[in-house]
C-alpha cells in the first residue's frame, strides 16, 4: 500500500547480509511503514484520490498513418493499375469467393470490373469512404475515459508498551475499455508489544481481495481490437446504424458465402467485449509473528514465523455468440465426400475455461544477532541463523464446451 510507506532504503552487499543474512547478500530494499506520531493518541489518516486519464489520441496523422482520404486515393490508384493486369478479374473473384481478406475498395473495384456498378457509382462510394474515420468511431464505442479511484484509511496509536496500526485501502479502475474493470481491497494490521524488558512481540495480518474483469482470449484480437490494422476509411456502422462486422486474416470476408454447416466469423468489437469475458478473483492472507529476546547487551535472538495463503480463480466465459466459440465449432467441423456435415463439438453453447490455483507458503526462522562497540572504535557485528521455507502450489484447470449459463440457474 503506497499510502502506508514512511521511507524506502536500499541496503547493498555486506550491509544487507549483516542484518538479514546470506539470502540478502546481493542487497535488499527496506520499506518502512508508518507509525503513530504521538503517544497516547489515535492518529487518523484518510485520503481519496481520483485520477482522470487523457483519452487516447486516435488521429491517423498523429499516429503516423495515412488519413482516410489519403488511403482511399492511394488504394484507388493501385486498383486502377491492378485492373490492367492479366486475369485481374479472375484473381479478384477467387480472392472473394475463397474467403481471403479483402477491403471495401477492392470489392467495389471488382463489382465495377465485372459490370455490376458504373464508374459513377464507384466514384460515389469512394467519395463516401473519404468521409469515414474508423479509428474515431471505434474509440467512441469501445473506449471510455479511464478513471482510477483510490481511498485509504489508517488508524494508528502507540504507548510506552505497544503500538497498533490498521490500514484499509480500496482501489477501483474502470480500465478504459468498456465492460472491463478492477476492484482491489487490502486490509493490514500490525501490532508491537513490549511484553517484558527482555521480550518484544510483533504480529501482523494482511488481507487482499481483488476482482478483475477483462476481455477473454480472442484469436482475432488484432482484427477486432486494433483499429490500425483495418482500413481507415472502412465504415464502422452499417446503413441501419448497427455496428459493422470486421474480418481479419483467417476469418474470411463479408462478401463470400460461408460454406454449409460452418459459422460466419465476422465480429464487432462492442459485442465481443460482452460475449467473451475473463474474470480473475484473488484472495490472499498473510500472517506473521516475531519474537525478539534481549539476552544481554548487544545480543538478541529472534524467532519469526510467517504463513501465507493465496487463492486465485480465473474464469473465461465465451458465450455461443463469441468469436472464440465459433472458431472452435468451425475448427472441429468436418464434411465428408458426400457433403454431410459432422460436428465434433457441441453445436450450441459456448466455452467455459476455469483455472484454480491455491498457494500455501510458510517461513520459520531463528536468528542470533550480536552488535557491540569496544573501546569506542571497534565494531563487532555477527549473526547466526537457521531458516525453513516451504512453497506449495497446486490447482486445477477445466474446459467445458457447449456451456450455457442460463441452464445453470
Show where each model-derived region lies.
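Short acidic/polar hinge/loop motifs at secondary-structure boundaries
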Residues: 1-12
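Short, glycine-/polar-rich solvent-exposed loops and beta-turns at beta-strand/coil boundaries
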Residues: 1-3, 20-25, 180-183, 217
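Transmembrane beta-barrel domains of outer membrane proteins
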Residues: 11, 32-34, 154-158, 167, ...
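N-terminal periplasmic accessory domains that precede
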Residues: 18, 24-48, 151-153
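A generic beta-sheet turn/junction motif
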Residues: 24, 37, 157-161, 170
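Surface-exposed loop/interface segments of Gram-negative outer-membrane beta-barrel transport/assembly proteins
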Residues: 38-133, 175-180, 186, 190-284, ...
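Transmembrane beta-strand segments that form the barrel wall of outer-membrane beta-barrel proteins
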Residues: 168-174
